[in-house]
């Protein structure tokens, strides 16, 4: 379960500041507390409840071993999102959203593989065999791919969810996620439509302090889910080991069969055995003669 949200901390971070009243989206009305100086003020108690709800859901996704893709291309959110996504070991997009990132994921994966292929060329020496012009072109291509796709190089399949900062700006990512039924978690300001996302966090998506507060909470929830998964795996391994040991202890031990004595191959032992056999034969012969002699005397 995600950590409890402190409303005072949200207030200090300026999470409650919305947009100008003339730029509002009527669908955000349930999350607006009041209007002050022509600006809408977000209800922080509702923001805290929604943050908790989103945090719990994201922790469960992380605990299942699936990836959550962070999306934020606006200037004031880039560095914050990149830092927090890396902390949670999750992929992220902070540069221009590549068209078809989700709906044409196969092509995106090919571009990522191309990047890995260039790295292999540099390792095995193939790169050095190219002309100076070709090396320059390959380096430029590698730098471009790294800038746009380097942060998703570990994402081998479609993400289980998206976390978005500013749904109005990232509308293409939202549309692609809708087509593939990928759940969307997002910071939603008073000028955006909350119906576009599955888990909204009513919040100021323009101020860096507000973005940092919300995104760090989300990242911490994901880290918590990952640590839960790790501990579950560890417990499972211990249980399996204990079960195997218990079975081996209960299994009946096989009785060792006594092996028949093998005749000695030693020369002296053989000689002794032969003499013993002869003594037995002589003894039995003398007994037979004595018995015959005795019977004759009786007659």
From Swiss-Prot:
Signal peptide range: none
Region (Disordered) location: 227-299
Coiled coil regions, renumbered to chain: none
GO MF annotation terms: structural constituent of ribosome
GO cellular component: cytosolic small ribosomal subunit
Statement: the UniProt record of this protein carries the keyword Magnesium: no
GO biological process: translation
Domain of life: Bacteria
PROSITE patterns named among the record's database cross-references: RIBOSOMAL_S2_1 (PS00962), RIBOSOMAL_S2_2 (PS00963)
InterPro entries: Ribosomal_uS2 (IPR001865), Ribosomal_uS2_bac/mit/plastid (IPR005706), Ribosomal_uS2_CS (IPR018130), Ribosomal_uS2_flav_dom_sf (IPR023591)
Keywords of the record: Ribonucleoprotein, Ribosomal protein
CDD domains, alphabetized: RPS2
NCBIfam families referenced in this protein's UniProt entry, alphabetically: rpsB_bact
Family: Belongs to the universal ribosomal protein uS2 family.
The protein's name: Small ribosomal subunit protein uS2
The encoding gene: rpsB
């Amino acid at each position: 379960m995600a950590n409890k949200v402190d409303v005072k901390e949200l207030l200090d971070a300026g999470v409650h500041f919305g947009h100008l009243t003339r730029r509002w989206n009527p669908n955000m009305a349930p999350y607006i507390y009041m209007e002050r100086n022509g600006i809408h003020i977000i209800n922080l108690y509702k923001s805290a409840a929604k943050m908790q709800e989103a945090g719990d859901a994201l922790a469960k996704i992380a605990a299942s071993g699936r990836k959550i893709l962070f999306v934020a291309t606006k200037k004031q959110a880039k560095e914050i999102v990149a830092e927090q996504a890396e902390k949670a070991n999750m992929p992220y997009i902070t540069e221009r959203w590549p068209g078809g990132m989700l709906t044409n994921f196969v092509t995106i994966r090919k571009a990522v593989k191309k990047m890995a292929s260039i790295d292999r060329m540099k390792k095995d020496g193939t790169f050095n065999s190219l002309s100076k012009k070709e090396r320059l072109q390959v380096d430029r291509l590698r730098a471009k791919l790294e800038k746009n796709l380097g942060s998703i190089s570990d994402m081998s399949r479609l993400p289980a969810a998206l976390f978005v900062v500013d749904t109005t700006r990232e509308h293409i990512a939202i549309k692609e996620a809708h087509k593939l039924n990928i759940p969307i978690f997002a910071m939603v300001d008073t000028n955006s439509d909350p119906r576009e996302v599955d888990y909204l966090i009513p919040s100021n998506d323009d101020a860096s302090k507000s973005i940092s507060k919300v995104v760090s909470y989300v990242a911490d929830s994901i880290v918590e889910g990952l640590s839960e998964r790790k501990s579950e795996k560890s417990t499972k391994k211990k249980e399996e080991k204990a079960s195997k040991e218990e079975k081996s202890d209960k299994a009946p031990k096989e009785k060792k069969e006594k092996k028949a004595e093998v005749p000695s191959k030693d020369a002296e032992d053989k000689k002794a055995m032969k003499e013993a056999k002869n003594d037995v034969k002589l003894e039995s012969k003398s007994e037979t003669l004595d018995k015959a002699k005795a019977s004759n005397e009786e007659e």
